[in-house]
Amino acid sequence: MALTLAATALVLLPLVTAQQIGSIAENHPELTTYRCSSQAGCVAQSTSVVLDINAHWIHQNGAQTSCTTSSGLDPSLCPDKVTCSQNCVVEGITDYSSFGVQNSGDAMTLRQYQVQNGQIKTLRPRVYLLAEDGINYSKLQLLNQEFTFDVDASKLPCGMNGALYLSEMDASGGRSALNPAGATYGTGYCDAQCFNPGPWINGEANTAGAGACCQEMDLWEANSRSTIFSPHPCTTAGLYACTGAECYSICDGYGCTYNPYELGAKDYYGYGLTIDTAKPITVVTQFMTADNTATGTLAEIRRLYVQDGKVIGNTAVAMTEAFCSSSRTFEELGGLQRMGEALGRGMVPVFSIWDDPGLWMHWLDSDGAGPCGNTEGDPAFIQANYPNTAVTFSKVRWGDIGSTYSS
């Protein structure tokens, strides 16, 4: 049974803030995940997911007027953070399938498009993994651990990205007197791109137009033709609201990227290749420390795959400081050590599907990064030719090295 949360998650907050939560209940779809150990094997967890706050309806308290406009916050309702919090309420989402999220047991399918009222609507859902309490995010501490999942990328054409990554978001989603909704309603997103997240930052009105920076570990950015993984360290811990030029110097937005195609393995990943994207793939990422303990310094990030019962190694042995030495600002901003510090503090799993209207995803699958043509990533082309675009993630698990997969 899915988790239905309206006021339940907020009982510990002062009553004065209850007016900021609307009357429509939030109905989190359950997504079973697994915590694994060498001794006990994998144990199921009753976790769930929540859509980002920007997918929720936030409106004037006692009225139907939205607190946002096409250009951002409505200045008459949100001239500042405090007034905005007093004027606006957030409503829950009861039907996640209408936002492109369909869960069943330990599997979740994210859909890019949906026909609504006879028209194809672009959805681009992004969801975060909640802990078993349904109130806070699952923050995974992965030093000297591995993170594994199964993925079906067969319905992701050129120009699409079905992503699973880690973000150093606050476990509560920044829950506070001005943001009583918190993680329960998907607040607090941040990443190493430091982009302006829109009207809300850490659940509060983003009246300054700040960017939301934090460390990011891209476990999987991929479609059926190309794949990358990349750590993105930052000089700060947790979410940092940046403004102006500092938004370009706090985090390594480019990251240390591993792309097998770009490194010359052109027959490694794709339909019918060594990693056959026509079939589901098990993806394993291992975070190895220098002393093989959960408190050690991150020394390597290893990647391997399992398909048809066979363990398939990565085309490079591991991602190390030596491998990343030429990656723009990666070393300057702390490299693997800084990334490891975030993994030690804990990071939140993020799942998404999206297209790229600005760059057409060339950085992932074209212009030397993959085999796709220069125009195949045009969102209009994708919508016209691949209306069933989707990605399915399943059997998400994490734990001791070697405990999450078998051959």
UniProtKB/Swiss-Prot annotation:
Question: Molecular function terms in GO for this entry?
Answer: cellulase activity
Alphabetized InterPro entries for the sequence: ConA-like_dom_sf, Glyco_hydro_7, Glyco_hydro_7_sf
Gene3D superfamilies to which the protein is assigned, alphabetical: Glycoside hydrolase, family 7, domain
**Where is carbohydrate linked to this protein?**
136
Q: Where is this chain's protein located in or outside the cell?
A: Secreted
Q: Which domain of life is it from?
A: Eukaryota
Q: Which reaction does it catalyse?
A: Endohydrolysis of (1->4)-beta-D-glucosidic linkages in cellulose, lichenin and cereal beta-D-glucans
The family annotation for this protein states:
Belongs to the glycosyl hydrolase 7 (cellulase C) family.
- Per its database record, what is this protein's job? Has endoglucanase activity on substrates containing beta-1,4 glycosidic bonds, like in carboxymethylcellulose (CMC), hydroxyethylcellulose (HEC) and beta-glucan. Involved in the degradation of complex natural cellulosic substrates.
- Name of this chain's protein: Probable endo-beta-1,4-glucanase celB
Which gene is annotated as encoding this protein in its UniProt record?
celB
